[in-house]
């Protein structure tokens, strides 16, 4: 396996990236400028195409999977930035916990 693919796996299913299974960057928070804010705070995850875009479980087709990632992203942001819930909501517009 080429070095560029070592240790990269899907955040949800842990499928390892290969030449034939490329991982895609998913911005945890999107819409109304939140994609750029996600970039700024490192709130992105790598997903295989199936977990990213394929029904029925792909994050863009499944509200439960999306909520799981929103909750993960909120916890990560609050922990890494030292924010309380109110600060998170002031930046991202919603509490997901």
Where in the sequence are the language-model features?
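Amphipathic alpha-helical interface surfaces
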Residues: 21-24, 43-47, 73
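Short flanking/linker segments adjacent to small metal-binding domains or redox-active Cys/His motifs
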Residues: 71-97
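Short Cys/His-centered divalent metal-binding micro-motifs
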Residues: 44-69
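Short linker/helix segments within small regulatory modules
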Residues: 29-44
